[in-house]
Amino acid sequence: MADGGLIGLYPGTFDPITNGHLDIIGRAAQLCSKLVIGVARNAGKGPLFPTAERVEMVRAEIAPIAERTGTEIDVQAFDSLLIAFAQQVSAQVIVRGLRAVSDFDYEFQMAGMNARLDQRIETIFLMASERHQFISSRFVKEIAQLGGDISSFVPKLTLERTLRRVGRP
């Protein structure tokens, strides 16, 4: 452990950030003295929001968590290899959320590859809370684009921005 406590990195595209992401961030913040939220540029996924706007939304939505937990939470965009970004921000752990068994298979492989690239950085998995196990940014975008109600899946600011982005009032 580094001087001052554990530094964690929670990476994702956050396109958009969901209540499930916020749940994982809140729980990770209780484990770490500093938590970096890495917003992946990931143009290959065809993001709904540009990177800068995703960073801005994440910053706005996590502010109450940082205040409540007293944890330093930093939000940064990145477009490098995840392990290289983890090294850059001095993370000792990469935090990943798991919703279902299907998530585990992919995440297990990624954790193994990351360990091969830098065995000093651990991956820790946090299980999604029961009420958030089915939420994904992909489903949120699809439901919003098709006129469905996403208000129980995303926080208020993100709800407003997502509805505007898909052309809904």
Swiss-Prot record:
It is an enzyme of class 2 (transferase). This is Phosphopantetheine adenylyltransferase. GO terms for biological process: coenzyme A biosynthetic process. Reversibly transfers an adenylyl group from ATP to 4'-phosphopantetheine, yielding dephospho-CoA (dPCoA) and pyrophosphate. Belongs to the bacterial CoaD family. Disulfide bonds: none annotated. GO terms for molecular function: ATP binding; pantetheine-phosphate adenylyltransferase activity. Substrate binds at residues 13, 45, 82, 96.
